[in-house]
A protein has these predicted regions:
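Non-catalytic terminal/interface segments that mediate subunit docking, oligomerization
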Residues: 1-52, 57-80, 168-178, 185-204
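Short acidic (Asp/Glu) and glycine-rich catalytic loops that position anionic groups and cofactors
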Residues: 18-25, 49-55, 87-95, 111-119
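Acidic, glycine-rich active-site loops and adjacent beta-strand->loop/helix elements
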Residues: 59-63, 93-98, 129-130
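Catalytic or ion-translocation cores adjacent to nucleophile or general acid/base/metal-coordination motifs
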Residues: 66-68, 74-97, 114
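Active-site phosphate/pyrophosphate-binding segments
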Residues: 85, 98-198
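Conserved small/polar residues in nucleotide/adenosyl-binding loops
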Residues: 205-210
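Hydrophobic alpha-helical segments, chiefly the membrane-spanning helices
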Residues: 216-218
């Protein structure tokens, strides 16, 4: 929706992400048909055929990962153990009841976490844009391939507090833990671990001044 712009006079479509550098890789984006089982099977095969490409499949908001559950269970979670083949496919799964009713939470965190075993997959719930950038970058920088599942709540797309500094993108790497810089470290008596959208929910009920409770992002 926002990756492609169109020239009004010529109807030419321009992908800005393909205009960053002459030495960059190729960026393509497609609207896939609503056959999650077939589409995710194709993406799994594409990622296996070209392990140097960052292949990402985003489930539509509305519990549409259900239709692809066979691929997720039989291939993503267990493929390496059964067939000794690695795969670096990335899944963006919308998460959370965000005012749309019971059928609008594509990713049940507990279900995906229960399927983690023997280093078979990465499951992430990123809190900052920079951390999400670094985990995607790490996906290709690594010398091996593992599936990566990222929970992507829609409410964070335009949240005014979900920002990162430019230097956070340019430096460092993926952080497993992000400390709370608003806490008074000398007076902390309560430590709360949260991740993703829950961190920003917590901020609504805390004071902007240094406090005696620390909220650490996992």
């Amino acid at each position: 929706r926002h990756a492609i712009i169109k020239v009004e006079e010529s109807e030419e479509e321009i992908s800005l992400l393909n205009c960053i550098s002459e030495k960059q890789g190729k960026f393509t984006i497609y609207n896939s048909l609503l056959s999650e089982y077939g589409v995710l099977g194709f993406e799994y095969g594409y990622a296996m055929t070209d392990p140097k490409s960052l292949t990402i499949w985003e489930a539509q908001f509305g519990d549409f990962s259900n239709g692809a559950q066979i691929i997720i269970d039989q291939y993503l979670f267990s493929g390496e153990h059964k067939w000794k083949t690695q795969n670096g496919l990335v899944l963006f799964l919308p998460h959370g009841y965000e005012g749309q009713g019971a059928e609008h939470s594509s990713a049940r965190m507990e279900r995906y976490l229960q399927s983690c075993a023997k280093d078979n997959v990465f499951v992430a719930n990123c809190t900052t844009p920079a951390n999400m950038f670094h985990i995607l970058r790490r996906q290709l920088q690594a010398k091996y391939r593992k599936p990566l599942i990222i929970f992507t709540p829609k409410s964070l797309l335009r949240h005014p507090m979900v920002t990162s500094k430019v230097e956070d993108f340019a430096n460092g790497g993926f952080k497993l833990v992000i400390d709370d810089n608003l806490a008074n470290v000398d007076k902390v008596n309560t430590l709360v671990f949260v991740s993703g959208k829950f961190y920003y929910d917590c901020l609504l009920y805390t004071s902007p001044n240094p406090r005696d409770g620390q909220i650490s992002r996992m």
